[in-house]
Regions:
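Non-heme Fe(II) oxygenase metal-center motifs and adjacent flexible, charged/small-residue loops
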Residues: 1-214
């Protein structure tokens, strides 16, 4: 199923690397301690050229919409998604550059990618943690925003008040420490007039394993 009002996927869409710039020094990074062992980091304007990359991905990615079963009922997920289980042949060379920069900075090899497409403010993601891609006690999960700004909420898994971030196009949100064990996050519904947003979740097959290789 294609996105509302979007063109169907087209293959082999690339833009020049020099149209995309990364802040490899992470100079704007601001880290917030969520508790004694969990943190979240916002890196404003980590990627420049995000709108051009957004347009490329909207056309090139084979977006799909899936059903999910909850409480014995079948629901259509309120967003489109895509997964690339390998970055060896990346959809876009800029994504390989981004994965390399993240690996150098955070010391984690990011080798696959999960993408969410929020077509407008009606699309959302409910409260969850990344339990399948983050099986170790401590993981580092970078999420890059392209397109419209949307609220990104986090709250303790055991219950409590939420904190809100609002990443804009090119901003990076990074969850670290025990965030995927002890906290949950979501992108709530908003005004329908809000534009298209893509989130790129950089994932690591190493973090998806329960214990490190010996």
């Amino acid at each position: 199923m294609t996105a509302r009002g979007l063109r169907p996927p087209q293959p082999d869409l690339f833009i020049a690397r020099d149209e995309i710039e990364l802040d490899r020094a992470f100079a704007t990074a601001r880290r917030t301690a969520l508790d004694a062992s969990s943190w979240v980091e916002l890196v404003p304007a980590w990627l420049r050229g995000g709108e051009r990359l957004l347009e490329s991905l909207l056309e090139a990615v084979p977006w799909q919409q899936h059903y999910r079963r909850m409480f014995d009922q079948r629901f259509l997920e309120p967003r489109l998604t895509a997964q690339y289980q390998s970055l060896r042949n990346p959809l876009h060379r800029a994504l390989l550059d981004a994965a390399s920069a993240l690996a150098d900075h955070y010391g984690v090899k990011y080798d696959n990618l999960w993408l969410n497409l929020y077509r407008d403010g009606r699309d959302s993601t409910g409260w969850h943690r990344d339990r399948f891609s983050c099986r170790r006690p401590e993981c580092i999960v970078p999420v890059l925003t392209l397109g419209a700004a949307r609220r990104f909420l986090l709250k303790p898994r055991a219950g409590g008040s939420s904190i809100a971030l609002e990443p804009h196009c090119g901003d990076l949100v990074v969850m670290g420490g025990r965030c995927q064990q002890d906290w949950v996050h979501c992108v709530p519904k908003d005004d329908a007039s809000i534009g298209v947003r893509i989130s790129l979740n950089f994932q690591s097959s190493e973090q998806a394993r329960v214990t490190p290789d010996r």
